[in-house]
């Protein structure tokens, strides 16, 4: 195996490891349990979206490119239906663009690339402004790794980001926020 092929394989393995890190499942679950609001989660892999949905059963549905059109339609309908118990839709990039649902209050980016456009699109899909609404955009990352570098790169132009390390700190930031939108990292 040439050095270039080995390097490429190592980079893919690093991405997979960071995108699907077990601590991100735990953090997402804790956030969803704590805030108990309609939530969309974004990830980079179908595997993560499906595993997170399993972790959050019966309150979550997946939505991704590997699903049949009817299953996607049902996932959206169940998430939108106020009579449904579904409060979380877990997606792997499929809803990054062109998806609008009123009432989503929290978005959790479990994994992302370094692209600021992706970050902007995900924010727009998840947090629609409405008078009196507080929207919460949370980015999960593994500190001191490439994951953190990707986050910093895609958020270079973000002016209202608050960096915290725990759900407790998110609650404190929310109680002190005078803004109607808080972007928590």
PLM segments and residue spans:
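Short beta-strand/turn micro-motifs composed of small residues
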Residues: 43, 64, 111, 139-143
């Amino acid at each position: 195996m040439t050095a270039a092929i080995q390097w490429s394989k190592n980079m893919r393995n690093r991405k997979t490891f960071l995108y699907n890190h077990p601590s991100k499942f735990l953090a997402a679950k804790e956030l969803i349990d704590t805030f108990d609001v309609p939530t969309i989660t974004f990830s980079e892999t179908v595997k993560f979206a499906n595993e997170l949905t399993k972790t959050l059963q019966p309150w979550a549905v997946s939505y991704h490119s590997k699903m049949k059109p009817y299953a996607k339609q049902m996932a959206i309908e169940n998430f939108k239906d106020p009579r449904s118990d579904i409060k979380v839709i877990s997606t792997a990039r499929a809803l990054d663009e062109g998806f609008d649902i009123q009432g989503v209050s929290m978005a959790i980016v479990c994994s992302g690339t370094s692209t600021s456009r992706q970050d902007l699109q995900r924010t727009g899909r998840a947090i629609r402004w409405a008078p009196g609404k507080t929207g919460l955009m949370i980015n999960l990352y593994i500190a001191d790794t490439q994951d953190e570098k990707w986050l910093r790169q895609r958020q270079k132009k973000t002016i209202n980001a608050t960096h915290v390390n725990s759900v407790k700190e998110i609650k404190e930031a929310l109680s002190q926020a005078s803004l109607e939108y808080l972007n928590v990292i």
